[in-house]
Amino acid sequence: MIDFDGYRPNVGIVICNRKGQVLWAKRCGQNSWQFPQGGINDNESAEQAMYRELHEEVGLQPKDVRLLYVSKHWLRYKLPKRLLRYDSKPMCIGQKQRWFLLQLVSDEKNINMQTTKSPEFDGWRWVSFWYPVRQVVSFKRDVYRKVMKEFASILFTDNPLIFSASREANSLHYSANKKYSQTKYTKRHFYKSRGQ
């Protein structure tokens, strides 16, 4: 489903843990990382699409998370010309997204990126709250900056314990994350970093 302006309606999902870190997912077969996201079907609300994508991409059920906040507005980004499919009608020029902030309330062992025959991701890790804004692919960066700013005002204001833990985590994980982003990792590293 593509709107009259050429944007595909989409949901984005930010999952945080009790330390204020967020789940950062690695796209299959690529050294590219992002938050889970996916299209909204014709017969779905944005919230229904979010829970479907949550299960398909991350393996979590509604009982595994708590919905903290939904972005007030649709946020848009345009695709680079090299990613446009000029032969498709109607042509999609980008995504318009409604973003959801979730807190993981179950064990992280329930996270499973392999629930479908064609998974989107083949690895994940917890990163400090602002890390994704610096690391996401450039054409999504403005949307990530806006959504994380909006979510920060909710998450850190309403959850002082998370706020204090996150400040510490941000200072501890910045150098490690910077080093990590410059290194090519295999699946073995993901499991090792998670203590498995």
Swiss-Prot record:
Cellular component GO terms, alphabetical: cytoplasm
The organism's place on the tree of life at top rank: Bacteria
Top EC class, one word: hydrolase
E.C. numbers: 3.6.1.-
One record GO biological process: mRNA catabolic process
Intervals of motif Nudix box: 38-59
Cofactor: a divalent metal cation
GO terms of molecular function: mRNA 5'-diphosphatase activity
Annotated ranges, domain Nudix hydrolase: 6-149
Keywords linked to the UniProt accession: Hydrolase
InterPro entries linked: Nudix_hydrolase (IPR020476), NUDIX_hydrolase-like_dom_sf (IPR015797), NUDIX_hydrolase_CS (IPR020084), NUDIX_hydrolase_dom (IPR000086), RppH (IPR022927)
Stored HAMAP family: Nudix_RppH
Entry-linked NCBIfam families: PRK00714.1-1, PRK00714.1-4, PRK00714.1-5
Entry similarity comment: Belongs to the Nudix hydrolase family. RppH subfamily.
Stated role: Accelerates the degradation of transcripts by removing pyrophosphate from the 5'-end of triphosphorylated RNA, leading to a more labile monophosphorylated state that can stimulate subsequent ribonuclease cleavage.
Designated name of the protein: RNA pyrophosphohydrolase
Protein's organism: Haemophilus influenzae (strain ATCC 51907 / DSM 11121 / KW20 / Rd)
High-level lineage: Bacteria, Pseudomonadati, Pseudomonadota, Gammaproteobacteria, Pasteurellales
Originating gene: rppH
